[in-house]
Amino acid sequence: MEEGERWREGHVYQRSSETRKPTNYDRPDSPVTHYVSDTHIVGTLMDELEVETGLITTILIATFNEMRRSHKPNELDDNINWWRHEVFYQIYPRSFKDSDGDGIGDLKGITSKLQYFVDTGITAIWLSPIYKSPMVDFGYDISDYRDIQPEYGTLEDFDALIAKANQLGIKVILDFVPNHSSDEHEWFKKSAAREPGYEDFYVWEDGIPGDNETRLPPNNWVSVFSGSAWQWHEERQQFYLRQFTKGQPDLNYRNPAVVQAMDEVLLYWLQKGVAGFRIDAVIYIYEDEQLRDEPLSGSTSDPNSVDYLEHIYTRNLPECYGLIQHWRQLLDNYTADNPGPVRIMMTEGYADLSLLMNYYEDEDGVQGAHFPFNFDFITELNANSAAPDFVYFIQRWLTYMPPGHSANWVMGNHDNPRVASRYGVGTVDAMNMLMMTLPGIGITYYGEELGMVDYRDISWNDTVDQPACDAGLDNYKWVSRDPERTPMQWSDEKNAGFSTGDSTWLPVHPNYQELNLLTQQEATYSHYKVYQSLIKLRQSRVLRDGSFTAQALNRNVFAIKRELRGQPTLLTVINVSNRTQQVDVSNFIDLPNRLTLLVVGVCSQHRVSERLKPAEVKLSPHEGLVIQLKAR
């Protein structure tokens, strides 16, 4: 599923034209050795293809054998490696908690809920943009990189949030949007007026002469949100590049002054105490200097569609990697000069695997991002995926990730439908079990711990997402990102406990009286309590340091195993089908074992501490189980 394309119920998604091309990343066919996570696990990755009569069953086995350094954890290790096994919780500030009754979430609201993260077990939060903005794209159009959007509060409110978070042991990550600013930023106004020093802060071009003294765009480049990526500016009498909305002009990073200005922005927020940054839309930062037309993709006949072209001149140019490496050095230097935890950088971009891996490091080992986001659970897998598909995409990332780096697993975000809406309401617990028991880093979008669902019936009058508004009354529902951005459902009180106001910036989902945090905290079994149990389990040595094996047991069920010498083995088994399945895990676990259930889902017929027979593990539709193995 490509940026600009929306999820549709019942549709089977394929990779976009960019990622459908066969590459040497398509299927690993030879053993590969890797380091995984901060524990220096080393292992060999294997795959085997089993062909049966009338059915091709892919059994992909990924086995990481333990080889760890012998040392005791200490504060230095914690400061260096704190992020490698972290669960980062994404907060969409506008929707998280409103403190003043205006219907819009804010910084004081987030601060008031920091204890919630302590209670849940979350120790790192990532804030979507909070900078000053005209809110054309709800904060991803920044008019001042050093100030707070007034609706969200003040710089003093931000300082108070950081102070309280530090007191509670919570690290704060900021969204950083470098590709473009708002057209209301002083830089753009000065550039449009050709003020000295700012003439080339943005990408300006004359265009091509058209009929009747008109000017046509310089080339065929298409915006992510459809239509030309070039916008005519009457005052300057030139086109400016805008790969997103017309209110988001692309900055010109071939101008050293722009790089320096953004370096200073990063240092400004580092000095305020943030633990790092999520770099937005990193793949778009540079474009072809020659402005060459991009070739047709053959995916669609619509010239306004983002899928109309192969984006070889506007995405993932080599200079993108160089800039990320430059910012990594800036962060490393800041960490070296300022005691405390490593300041980290995670990058966001939907791209082919071979291109994403370059954001970790280049072929010479020069370090880039601490990790580029892995969107496979969003773009490659869906409710119709079979068990071997899950194992394959998990294995693929681990196989081609450079040695010494950490994997990550993004389950949802503000641009895509929620887990419960993509995979089905009954899958929420199983998907959280999967994310929490895989090696590396987990990314949780707010409300996913509760199983919140998209509000697909938001009316045209209540729609605020700009691309949806541009799509018009007949098409807005297929484009809108509003359904996954509705207010956090804290309780069954007015506005789900999000706000005391008479209205909220987006409607609260009508199911809030049944689906909310307070109800789930008080229930014997709930999605929240499953999530809480998984967070606690992640602190176990076997999940932090253990080896990893994955296998499709049949077309509908797969299992992952985590092992560490001297520790009980953990087994996660997931049924991705809508039918009850019974599987034999005896061969997968090798030795006779006692199986004891540690975590079960809300609707499971099993109960925690129940004993299972390896040859008769029964799973309800879409059920996941986390099992502890002890040798007899």
From Swiss-Prot:
Q: Where is this site: Transition state stabilizer?
A: 415
Where is the segment annotated Disordered?
1-30
Keyword Amino-acid biosynthesis attached: no
Q: What is its EC number?
A: 3.2.1.20
Which ranges form a coiled coil? none
> One GO MF term, please?
alpha-1,4-glucosidase activity
Q: Which GO terms describe its biological process?
A: carbohydrate metabolic process
- What superkingdom heads the lineage? Eukaryota
Q: What does it catalyze?
A: Hydrolysis of terminal, non-reducing (1->4)-linked alpha-D-glucose residues with release of alpha-D-glucose
Catalytic positions are: 280 (nucleophile), 348 (proton donor)
- Glycosylated residues are 179, 212, 333, 461, 575, 578
Swiss-Prot/TrEMBL keywords:
Glycoprotein, Glycosidase, Hydrolase, Signal
Q: Which Pfam families match?
A: Alpha-amylase (PF00128)
> Which residue ranges have biased composition labelled Basic and acidic residues?
1-29
Similarity remark: Belongs to the glycosyl hydrolase 13 family.
The protein's name is Maltase 1
List the gene name. Answer: Mal-B1
